[in-house]
Regions:
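Claisen-condensing/thiolase-fold acyl-transfer catalytic domains that form or cleave C-C bonds
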Residues: 1-94
Length: 94
């Protein structure tokens, strides 16, 4: 996605750039494991979180000034069985 150079992901996270309030907040809800990873409902849970962020309704998890949100979800084993990979980008209009 181009957030940092190859190999710089660790230092980026260590500097706090992926935390709430950082330059690129990642998983402010705690991610899929914090939700019990409900498999079939995973994508919907991700979209719900992103919608809450864009509406400014995420409470203590709120990312300040959220205008664009990216969701990635996949299922199955690509190349071995039927699988799917989806990337959704949501953007606040006003």
């Amino acid at each position: 996605l181009g957030f940092c150079a190859m190999g710089d992901g660790g230092p980026l996270a260590e500097r706090g750039e992926t935390r709430i309030g950082g330059r690129i907040p990642v998983n402010p809800s705690g991610g899929l494991e914090s939700k019990g990873h409900p498999i079939g409902a995973t994508g919907l849970g991700q979209i719900y979180e992103l919608t809450q962020q864009l509406r400014g309704a995420a409470g203590a998890r709120q990312v300040g000034g959220a205008r664009t949100a990216l969701q990635e979800n996949s299922g199955g084993l690509l190349g071995i069985e039927e699988g799917a990979a989806v990337v959704t980008i949501l953007q606040r209009q006003n």
